[in-house]
Amino acid sequence: GCDTVFTTGGAQSNHAALTAACAARLGMKCILLLKRRGVTEHRGNLVLDELFGAEVRLLDMDSYDEIYAEMHRIGGTLEQAGHKCCYIPVGASTALGAVGYVSGAREIAVQAMAAGVRLGHIVSATGSGGTAAGLLLGAGLFLPGVKVTGIAVDSSPFDKIVPRLAGEAAALLECPFQPEENAFQMVEHMGPGYALPNPEDTPYIEELARTEGNVLLTTGAKELGAFA
């Protein structure tokens, strides 16, 4: 098995923080190659990453292709020293990564049925496409007629990425993937940039905190703000 795991994302990547947490639990070394863009202070998930024991490298690179090359360069040196490395792409947006959210869609279906709630839409912030892909496939399997809406919090061609990943996840699970017409749509609400708060969303963050006691992260605030 592997003893070292690499992944990447924005400086405040939730995926990166979760990877660091899982690596800590499994006793693996975790190396995070994160984009420095937008970092003005050491806060949020950067603190958690280091708390979990991850080695954090902030890179002045905007292209993930460049970051992947650096990832494999570092990993190659470690492998020559006898380590075994696992490389996870941004957001774990692969067929296997999407499968986790197929299971999530099933859980949503079970809970909705138990609560007697009839769903029409599932809304998810979309930063790399894996979550939306898994929900799209899962909705088709467990929630017929329910549409998936992705809120773009980064700039990528999600209208192509999400259906492709959903199809690859279906192939991995050996299940059919024939989405209904208009089963998936994207709404752009990135604001100033990935992980950067949109000032227009501040009233919704405050209202939810003061009426429900719930605190939204930047991505969650953009989900809510997109429909306000």
Question: Which residues are covered by each model-predicted region?
Answer:
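PLP-dependent amino-acid enzyme catalytic core
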Residues: 1-228
